[in-house]
A protein has these predicted regions:
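Acidic/polar-rich alpha-helix caps and helix-coil junctions
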Residues: 1-39, 52, 56-228
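Aromatic (Trp/Tyr) and acidic
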Residues: 44, 48
């Protein structure tokens, strides 16, 4: 099991892993290779995302603030990113998968125990959650149901929140939204409102492919969007 072979790390060892721009560090299992051209793109992307503040919703998840090692490691006081983009697999992701799996298999106490262990590796002087002290479900969060369609419980939201905090800039957020209810999200750009509808979490088939093969059926929702 990845978590056993690559146990969770913390403190300076964790900082070294998160700030490393290349190579396998800490409990990384896989990391994308870097070529000269991809290195230039990496630097460009890291520079570009520093111009846009992080979501206030995301920053709000760090309730312990400075006690959480990620609070200063991932972004600064202006909510601008300071974390390196990472594409690969870390043992932390498997730990998060394990606690969510335990939850869905009915082992709520085991899931809580793993959640507390995970948070103890990220938050100094951590006080463990109990079922009674878990934060209430935040009705303002986008994700309102878990992957089974059931309404979020305090424990499941705590697990998903920890996943969101830990895997920031690791290509995880879109897929979390997709597998947990596909919530409609809107934003405003240049005075116009844009909404991500549920069907948009699955991309459309290219029109050229549909013309070549009349047997293909366009994914739901896109017939009106593309052709009307």
């Amino acid at each position: 099991m990845a978590v056993a072979a690559y146990p969770l790390i913390q403190g300076e060892e964790y900082k070294k892993m998160i700030t490393a721009e290349d190579g396998l560090q800490g409990n990384m299992l896989v990391r994308s290779d870097r070529t000269p051209s991809s290195s230039n793109m990496f630097k460009y992307l890291n520079t570009s995302i520093q111009r846009c503040p992080l979501s206030a919703r995301y920053v709000k998840l760090f309730a312990e603030k400075d006690s959480d090692i990620r609070y200063k490691l991932f972004f600064n006081k202006r909510r601008l990113n300071t974390k390196c983009i990472f594409t690969g697999l870390r043992s932390a992701e498997f730990a998060l998968i394990s606690m969510e799996s335990a939850y869905h298999l009915g082992d709520k106490e085991g899931a809580l125990r793993m959640l507390n262990d995970f948070r103890a590796h990220r938050i100094s002087s951590y006080t463990a959650y109990t079922m009674a002290t878990l934060p209430a479900v935040d009705a303002n969060e986008y994700i309102k149901t878990d992957c089974t369609g059931a309404a979020l419980t305090p424990l499941m939201q705590a697990i998903l929140n920890e996943r969101r905090k830990e895997l920031y800039l690791e290509g995880d957020r879109f897929f979390e939204l997709k597998r947990n209810g596909r919530p409609a999200i809107w934003s405003v750009y240049q005075g116009l409102k844009y909404t991500t509808e549920k069907f948009m979490y699955t991309f459309p088939l290219p029109p050229a492919d549909l013309q070549v093969n009349p047997g293909l059926i366009q994914n739901p929702g896109y017939t009106e969007v593309i052709y009307n």
